[in-house]
Amino acid sequence: NIAASIKKYYNRAMRLDFLIDGNNFDMAGEASSSVKRTLTKLGVAPPLVKRAAISMYEAEINAFIHGGGGSAHVEISDEKIEMVVEDSGDGIPDLDLAMQEGWSTASEQVRRMGFGAGMGLPNIKKNSDVLSIETEKGQGTKVTMIIYIREDKNT
C-alpha cells in the first residue's frame, strides 16, 4: 500500500521540488513526468496517477507559457497528493473567464506549437479534488491542487 511504501523509504510524507525554467522549452513538462514516475513507483492507483499527472502538467505548462517559469512543490502522503505551482508572471486578469473552456491569452507563437487551447485550468479543475488559485495582477499566480488518495481504490 502507499502508506507503507512512503514510510518504508521516507518515514514521512515525500516532498519533491522543481524549478520550472521559463527559457527552456525542452524541459517543459519534466516536473509532471517526474511526479508521474514517482507516484507509479509508490504504487498509487493508475487513475489517480493520471489525474495528478494531468493537473501537474497543465499547471506546469501554464507557468512556463504565461508566467515565464516558476517553481513546483509536490507533497505525497498516505492521504493526499498536494501539488503547488507558482510563477511570478503578470497574474490572471480575469480568473472566472480563464476557467471557461476555450478561453486563452496564449500568443500566436505558442498556439502554433500546439498549446494555448484554453483547456489548462478547466482540465486542472476536472482532475483535482481541491483547486485553489491565488493570482494578482503583476504579482504572479499560485495554483494549489489536491488529489485525495483513497486506499480502498488502490487495489
PLM feature spans:
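Bergerat-fold GHKL ATPase/HATPase_c domain
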Residues: 2-54
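Conserved beta-strand-loop-beta-strand hairpin that lines the nucleotide-binding pocket
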Residues: 5-15, 60-155
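Short acidic amphipathic alpha-helix that forms the conserved interface helix of the HATPase_c
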Residues: 53-57, 61
